Curated annotation (Swiss-Prot):
The lineage of its organism: Bacteria, Bacillati, Bacillota, Bacilli, Lactobacillales. It catalyses: (S)-2,3,4,5-tetrahydrodipicolinate + acetyl-CoA + H2O = L-2-acetamido-6-oxoheptanedioate + CoA. The keyword Acyltransferase applies. This is 2,3,4,5-tetrahydropyridine-2,6-dicarboxylate N-acetyltransferase. GO terms for molecular function: tetrahydrodipicolinate N-acetyltransferase activity. Catalyzes the transfer of an acetyl group from acetyl-CoA to tetrahydrodipicolinate. The gene is dapH.
Amino acid sequence: MTAQKMSAQEIIAFIGNAEKKTNVKVTFEGELATAVPSSVTKLGNVLFGDWKDIEPLLANLTENKDYVVEQDGRNSAVPLLDKRHLNARIEPGAIIRDQVTIEDNAVVMMGAVINIGAEIGAGTMIDMGAILGGRATVGKNSHIGAGAVLAGVIEPASAEPVRIGDNVLVGANAVVIEGVQVGNGSVVAAGAIVTQDVPENVVVAGVPARIIKEIDEKTQQKTALEDALRNL
């Protein structure tokens, strides 16, 4: 599923102009004494909608007036992505905001956080607890390791986002700093902090990350992806 590509200025405007909502689910006992507005969905004794629209209804409950409120945000500007029609594997617990592009056969594991404007290429895996900041881009058939961070750039609007190429492996807990580009076929070692652009087909490691060798057959074998993990 491809979202419309947004510039930093467009994302800032999107967030700034969005209606801020505190979406809740409320289960109540008794009866509502006032009509339910169109902005609120009522299914039996359950209400879905913005707290500002639901709170007045609860003040007019008849009988025992008991209710339970479930919420996960406050004055949120960006909803979560509708994942129903993605041709990808998204595991429970992944947090993916709206205006994110996820291409075919990508995998997003539990605990991953994908911010607005990020792009994930076909066949790419985002592992457990990895973070893709705003506008971060990952190419095709890459792997972003558990706990890795691709720093986001929404402000300042003039800054460039992180761009990871095709067939790249970013190791666990590595950090790629704002504006850095990692070339196709390269490997970022676990725990590395990448502060400068990385050319194609090299291995970088350390803090700050430096080139330690070119990709060879042994490295390719160690970093090969498993297609079966991307089957749907």
